[in-house]
Amino acid sequence: MTKFTLIAAFALTAVAAPVFADADIAKGESDFKKCKACHSIIAADGSKVQAGGKTGPNLFGVIGRPIGSYPDFAYGTGLLALNAKGDVWDEAKLAAYIADPTAWVKTESGDASLSAKMTFKMTSGAEDMAAYLASVK
């Protein structure tokens, strides 16, 4: 990790922490309707928290999960590269990804040739969505 990357990561963490303190879990839950076409939230016991599509991976327990690791899902090269680095989803990473998946993959990986398969961008409310997904356990 370069010195610049390390400084940028600390700066992002310092800026992101106050934003997540104001995140609205209920709004994130309500906004999940925008995600249901592609994603579901299904607990390990099979109970449905949010029924939805299968185009994207199940988002139950996504916070703390290694990036690009949900079983039997065909991830793109961007998330697979981050998985190979050992990256793990946290609220800040997930919110940044939700806001602009391809831009985040390029920045997080340091490889401008990589992209994300997810094309949807949540231009507002990404922090709320990440907080909601973190609350689902």
Please name every model-derived segment.
Residues 1-8:
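Bacterial N-terminal signal peptides that target proteins for export
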Residues 11, 16-18, 23:
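N-terminal signal peptide c-region/cleavage motif recognized by signal peptidases
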Residues 16, 26, 126-129:
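Generic low-polarity alpha-helical segments
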Residues 23-25, 29-87, 101-112, 136-137:
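Periplasmic/extracellular electron-transfer cofactor-ligation site
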Residues 87-137:
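C-terminal capping alpha-helices of c-type cytochrome domains
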